[in-house]
Amino acid sequence: MDNFIYGDVYSRGKLTDKQRELLTITALTASQTLDSLPAQVQAALEAGATPVEIKETLYQCAPYVGFPKTVGALEITNKVFKKQGIKMPLANQST
């Protein structure tokens, strides 16, 4: 399975690693596969996603997958940020 996901899927197409990780975070949130989320949040940071971009990705999930699912993902993401020394709360963004 890992070979399919990380070999075949990740090596195809025009998406950047950052874009792939943000999409993976979205899919994990929507499917409530939250046990895999910490590793993917970390991978997104390593791929160049900013904490704000990761949070915005999750905020965009709320109207489509529901607020309760999004809150769980945000709580996990905040734990990853804290472990990485990322100060919370993040600066306000205008949207």
Model-derived features: where do they sit?
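Short, charged low-complexity intrinsically disordered segments located at boundaries
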Residues: Q32-T33, I54-Y59, M88-Q93
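Short amphipathic alpha-helical segments at helix boundaries and their inter-helical linkers
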Residues: T29, T33-Q42, C61-I76
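Acidic, glycine/proline-rich low-complexity segments that act as flexible tails and inter-domain linkers
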Residues: M1-K18, V41-Q42, E46, T70-T95
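Generic hydrophobic/packing signal
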Residues: A49, L58-C61, V65, F81
